[in-house]
Amino acid sequence: MNKLVKIFMFLLLSSCSAIKKEVIDCPKLTSFKEAAEVVVKSEKNIPVYIGIRGVQTYCTDDNNDVDMELSINIRAIRNDTSIEDYVPVNISVVSLDASKNEYERDDFSYSQFMLKNSRIVDRSTQFNLSVPKGGEVLLGIR
């Protein structure tokens, strides 16, 4: 009986250690200026500046890949605050392998609500992406 308990405890503890992933350095993340800041037209045809205002990353080892979690803060700024409006935002995150070939892509589109009298609105959006080891990530808005 004692031997059975020891075997059970060993299996339980060894399986728990396999669940925890190893945290590693994240691959290179790049956003070209043309893809990091854009001026778009709102639904009511008013120009609105959209820009990336921060990125947080968390990466873990996943065999041949890196599992990358991103939190991207997008800021919308407008001058005309007299009306409520919606602004279209399109975010693309692309992982590339070492040969610069597309490995995985995640595109996300939404309408950012601009409340009356609100000049600046921030929104954080989460992504999860697989990146091959030795690869990199490109980030852009349009």
Which residue stretches match the model-derived regions?
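Sec-dependent signal peptide recognition
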Residues: N2-F10
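C-terminal motif of bacterial Sec signal peptides marking the signal peptidase cleavage site
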Residues: S14-S15
